[in-house]
Amino acid sequence: MSIKQWPEGERPREKLLERGAAALSDAELLAILLRVGTRGMSAVDLARYLLQEFGSLGRLMSAEVGKLSAYKGMGTASFTQFAVVREIGRRILEEELQEEITLSDPDTVADYLRFHLGQEKVEVSVALLLNRQNQLIAVRELSRGTVAENTIYIREIVKLALDEYADSLIIAHNHPGGSPEPSQEDIMFTRRLAQAMSLVDVSLLDHFIVTSQTVRSFRQLGLMP
């Protein structure tokens, strides 16, 4: 049965208009984005199938075009739509951070970092540069690559902070393997960086480790120098 044949109150679009987007399931939201299904499958059926195959909405939305294209009804058009949705979400979160980012609101920072780094397939490190009021000046990528390739030079971070006239910064990196626990190398690097930043009167406020499901804060773990 096609969605057009469903009772009006159960159709995703009509349900959204009547109850709001929060009332829809992941499959219903995805069905609105997909618009159509395939032969024998409504858009909602296709959405449910894809969510089951990929394991989560985040993994599906971050899938590469080649992997998406292996599924009937999916391809470059769907990949483009998903990429646009991800980027819009990232920019909205970045706008919120630029308006006000404070340590009293760590959830906003964690949400942004999870969205920005959580689905990366390789290790990526970023710096969030802040002014005296703890408002976001800029987000800069520090490195990208495998763990073996992902070398971050402290002097480059110091230079970046000075070039951007930052009063403080937050650094973050993802663990593609899924474990959010800081390694001994992470802890030692954070100590060395905090010491180097103090020499130029820039505060290292926190270091976050990000996975697709979890964000860990060094400050909350009691690991900040």
Curated annotation (Swiss-Prot):
Please name the SUPFAM superfamilies in this protein's record: JAB1/MPN domain (SSF102712), RuvA domain 2-like (SSF47781)
| Protein name per its UniProtKB record | UPF0758 protein NGO_0681
Say which species the protein is native to. Neisseria gonorrhoeae (strain ATCC 700825 / FA 1090)
PROSITE patterns listed in its UniProt record: MPN
Which keywords annotate this record?
A: Hydrolase, Metal-binding, Metalloprotease, Protease, Zinc
Residue stretches in coiled coil: none
Start and end residues of each MPN domain: 102-224
Question: Where do we find the motif JAMM motif here?
Answer: 173-186
UniProt cross-references to Pfam families, sorted A to Z = RadC, UPF0758_N
Decide whether keyword Coiled coil is in the record: no
- Residue sites binding Zn(2+) per the record: H173, H175, D186
- tRNA-binding listed as a keyword: no
Q: Which GO terms describe its biological process?
A: proteolysis
Q: What is the lineage of its organism?
A: Bacteria, Pseudomonadati, Pseudomonadota, Betaproteobacteria, Neisseriales
Q: Which family does it belong to?
A: Belongs to the UPF0758 family.
GO function term, MF aspect, one: metallopeptidase activity
